Structure formats: C-alpha cells, structure tokens
Swiss-Prot record:
It catalyses: L-methionine + ATP + H2O = S-adenosyl-L-methionine + phosphate + diphosphate. The gene is metK. Mg(2+) binds at D21. This is S-adenosylmethionine synthase. GO terms for molecular function: ATP binding; magnesium ion binding; methionine adenosyltransferase activity. GO terms for cellular component: cytoplasm. Catalyzes the formation of S-adenosylmethionine (AdoMet) from methionine and ATP. The overall synthetic reaction is composed of two sequential steps, AdoMet formation and the subsequent tripolyphosphate hydrolysis which occurs prior to release of AdoMet from the enzyme. Keywords: ATP-binding, Cytoplasm, Magnesium, Metal-binding, Nucleotide-binding, One-carbon metabolism, Potassium, Transferase. One of its GO terms (biological process) is one-carbon metabolic process.
Length: 407
C-alpha cells in the first residue's frame, strides 16, 4: 500500500539506559535520591563523567545526611547491565573517583532568603525561597497522543524501553546495554501524524551475532511489538524504512566506546525537538534548581491547558532571576490552536491565576522533596505511561476553565 502524501517529516530519538550519557544521568540521580532520602532538604548539584574503566563524580552538595557514593555508583552500573569489561564496563571493578565540595554560600544565601524576603519584611512564606539560578524553562503538551506528548518522541522512548526489556528478559539474546532509537513520522497539511516513515535502531551486541538474524528479531520483538502496544497500526499500513545498526556491527559500546556526561541528552529528556528548550539539564539537581523544578511545572501547566480543551497544543515559558522568588517572565503559545473565542493572552492570564510558579510553591504542590528522580533518568521525564509522576497530573483543568468562564 502506498503512503499518504507527507507535507513534512519530523524525527525524534531516544537512547537506552546503557548509553554513556544516560549512565551518567542515572548515577547523578541515584546519588540525588539517596541524599534526599537521608535529608529531604539536601541541596545537590552532582555531575558524572564515565570513560574507559572509571567513573568521576563531581559537584556541590549541602546536606545533613551521608551516602556511600562509590557503592551507589557500582550498584547502578550493575543494574544497567555493565558487569564485564567485555560489554564495555564492569561496575564491580571499575575505578570511582569522587570530588564533591560544599554548595557556594552565596548561592545558598540567595535560595534560603530571597530578594523579596530581604526587603522590608512584608512577604508571603512562599516568597522566602529564591530561585537557585537565573534561566528560562519551557513546557509543552499536544493532544496527538493520549499522554499529551509529541508522537515521535513518545514512540522513540517506547522503542528504547522495549529494547532494554528484551535484553534484560532474554527475549532477544546476545544484546548488550548500549543502544539508540530514532523514528520519523510524516505529518499532513493539518499538522496531524499521517504515517510512520522510518525507524532506526542501533544496539550493542555480542560478537557472534548475525546482522540478518538481529534485524528479524528486532522487527518482531521490538518494532512490531511497540506498534501493536501503542495502537499505531493505522499509521504503519504502508512501507516503513527500517534501519538496524546501519553503521555495521556494534560490539564495542558503553563508556569504552564513548565517554559519557550528565546532562547531554536534554532533547531526549524532554520533547524530542518538537518544543523549545531553555538549555538547562535535569539530572543530579535537587528541586531548588529551577532548571529542573520549573521545567516540570511548565509541563504540568501545558498539559493542563491541553487536557482542559483550551488548545490542541501549548508551549509555556517561565523565567527566573537567581535569588528571586517571583518569576520575571511567563509566556503562553498555542500555535493558533486555541479554542474558538480564546486568545493566548487570556490563557496566560488564567495560568497566572491558577498556578503559583514561585519555587517554594512548585516544590510543595508537586511534592518534589522526595527520592523520585532516578526513575526518570532514562526514557524521558514527561509523558511516562509507566510511572506516576506528579507533574503529569491533570488536576487543574477545572480551575483553568473556571478562570476563563467556561463550563
């Protein structure tokens, strides 16, 4: 069957938990979770670097708790599947170096006592905590999937999660932890997905694997499985270009193949390039860092806008100044998809009325002082159908509609 005519093609990618950058994200967030368990008020900024045979953990921390970082690092590496130098890393024998200092007192002072609280003494309790840095954060939602995520990144993540699942459960033998997925969807003139055009999977494997056998296995147990599981058969009726390990063999992977670094997969972590990004990474940061907490809040806002039926797509931006509680900017864009009779400015005013975007309020409303972050380190922070994440709640739809005078 021929494919429908495409107006444009859009591509997103994901990576597995064995990708070197994702190893680093997982280690950083595992350390963060352990510190929040020991002391929920911990201030954490932990970066990880992995390369052949060694893990470097660096950063700044303020906490009353104690965690055994090398033990956490090794446990996470083994959990991912790096148990032998043959597969690119051995979590049991690799070197682990730790160089963590104390959080800057000047930064701590600005977060503990905001500019508003340092004023004339007239301030609300949620004005007390200042933003941990300046910056801009975006959130996005669209009604093209049930989870209100862009379809390309949603499917790329499903493929990456399934690739890891078939490896760990032995459904497809001879796979190793490192891997990447990429999907290209065609969109029609109305900006709706019309068909799945291309799927790319690159996966690390044992030396004895035959490439033709591997393609058959991954088509059946990963690609076809995800298409059925996601209910995408109607978008996969034509010929799909499938590329499995298009560079050839992929035996050497993990940190032995490429060095990894925390925070280097920020588009994978968010919306797959379908929305703008403020540039700040998430992993290894406690929620006083608005790079993380405000980006989560913006996803919460955008998802509630779309779930409330106010627009088909929504992108929201917030901006902060370090040491100041109140945002310095808020912007709503619906790409001409707002409900008839509504403007972006009206929706923005409703958002300001319904959502308190001061850091202390975000942390309280989303209950962020909990060890919930390691589970987000791979396969995306948003639209996770396998996790119960507070920023995915659609619990403000009624209040948004009420603020706009809608029933």
């Amino acid at each position: 069957m021929s494919q429908p005519t495409a107006v444009r093609l859009f591509t997103s990618e994901s990576v597995t938990e064995g990708h070197p950058d994702k190893i680093c994200d997982a280690i950083s967030d595992t350390i963060l979770d352990a510190l929040l368990t020991a002391d929920p008020l911990s201030r954490v900024a932990v970066e990880t670097v992995v390369t052949t045979g060694i893990v470097h953990v660096v950063g700044e921390v303020r906490t009353s708790g104690y965690v055994e970082i090398p033990q956490l690092v090794r446990r996470k590496l083994i959990e991912i599947g790096f148990t032998s130098s043959d597969v690119g890393f051995d979590g049991r024998t690799c070197g682990v170096s730790v160089s963590i200092g104390e959080q800057s007192q000047e930064i701590a002072d600005g977060v503990d006592t905001s500019q508003e609280a340092r004023g004339d003494g007239h301030f609300e309790e949620d004005d007390r905590a200042g933003a941990g840095d300046q910056g801009l954060m975006f959130g996005y939602a669209t009604n093209e999937t049930p989870e209100f995520m862009p379809l390309p990144i949603a499917v790329a993540h499903r493929l990456a999660r399934r690739l890891t699942q078939v490896r760990k459960e032995g459904i497809v033998p001879h796979l190793r932890p490192d891997g990447k997925t990429q999907v290209t969807f065609a969109y029609d003139a109305d900006d709706n997905p019309s068909h799945l055009d291309t799927v790319v999977i690159s996966t690390q494997h044992d030396p004895e694997v035959d490439s033709a056998w591997l393609e058959v296995q991954l088509r059946e147990h990963v690609i076809d499985w995800v298409i059925r599981d996601a209910g995408l058969e109607h978008l996969a009726t034509g010929e799909i270009t499938v590329l499995i390990n298009p560079s050839g063999s992929f035996i050497l992977g993990g940190p032995m193949g490429d060095a990894g670094l925390t925070g280097r997969k920020i588009i994978v972590d968010t919306y797959g390039g379908m929305a703008r990004h403020g540039g700040g990474a998430f992993s290894g940061k406690d929620p006083s860092k608005v790079d993380r907490s405000a980006a989560y809040a913006m996803r919460w806002v955008a998802k509630n806008i779309v779930a409330a039926g106010l627009a088909d797509r929504a992108e929201v931006q917030v901006a902060y100044a370090i040491g100041r509680a109140k945002p310095v900017g808020l912007y709503v864009e619906t790409f001409d998809t707002a409900r008839e009779g509504l403007t972006d400015e009206q929706i923005q005013a409703a958002v300001s009325q319904v959502f308190d975007l001061r850091p202390a309020a975000i942390i309280r409303e989303l209950d962020l002082l909990r060890p919930i972050y390691a589970q987000t380190a791979a396969y995306g922070h948003f639209g996770r159908t396998d996790l119960d994440l507070p920023w995915e709640a659609t619990n403000r739809t009624g209040r948004l509609r009420e603020a706009l005078g809608l029933k």
